[in-house]
Amino acid sequence: MAKSSKASSAAAKKLSPEALIRSFESSQQKDDLPEIYVGDTVRVGVRISEGNKERVQPYEGVVISKRHGGLNQTITVRRIFQGIGVERVFMLHSPQVASIKVERRGKVRRAKLFYLRERVGKATRVKQRFDR
C-alpha cells in the first residue's frame, strides 16, 4: 500500500504536457509590456547587431493587427517611409524587441486595419482616442 501512495504522489508532481509548456512559456514572457490595441501608434525599439556592436533602432507606426496570445503574440506595425508603405511583424516577447512605447491611442472600430493599405495620404490617419 505504501508503494501505491508513493507512485501517486510522483504522478501528481509530474506535469501534463500542456501545463509544462505553459509553465515554460510564462517564465519566458516579458512582464513590462504596455497595453497595446489595434489603431495605436507605437514606437518599437528593435535590437540590431552590426559586427560586434549592438544598437537599438526605433520603428514607429500604426498597429494594424494583433495575433495570437501568450509567448507567440505578434503585432503588425505599418508606416509610410519615403512614400512607400512598410509593414513589420514583431513578436512582442522576442529578445530582439528592446522596448515598446505607445505614442498615442487610436480610435478604430475594426480588429484588423488592412484597409489602410489601399489608402493614401491623409486618409491613412487614425482618429485619436483620449479615454484609455
UniProtKB/Swiss-Prot annotation:
**UniProt GO cellular component terms:** cytosolic large ribosomal subunit
Q: Which UniProt keywords apply?
A: Ribonucleoprotein, Ribosomal protein
- Return the InterPro entries for the record: Ribosomal_bL19, Ribosomal_bL19_CS, Ribosomal_bL19_sf, Translation_prot_SH3-like_sf
Q: Please list the GO biological process terms of this entry.
A: translation
Q: In the record, what terms sit under GO molecular function? A: structural constituent of ribosome
| Purpose | This protein is located at the 30S-50S ribosomal subunit interface and may play a role in the structure and function of the aminoacyl-tRNA binding site.
Q: Member of which family?
A: Belongs to the bacterial ribosomal protein bL19 family.
Q: Please state what the protein is called.
A: Large ribosomal subunit protein bL19
Gene from which this protein is expressed: rplS
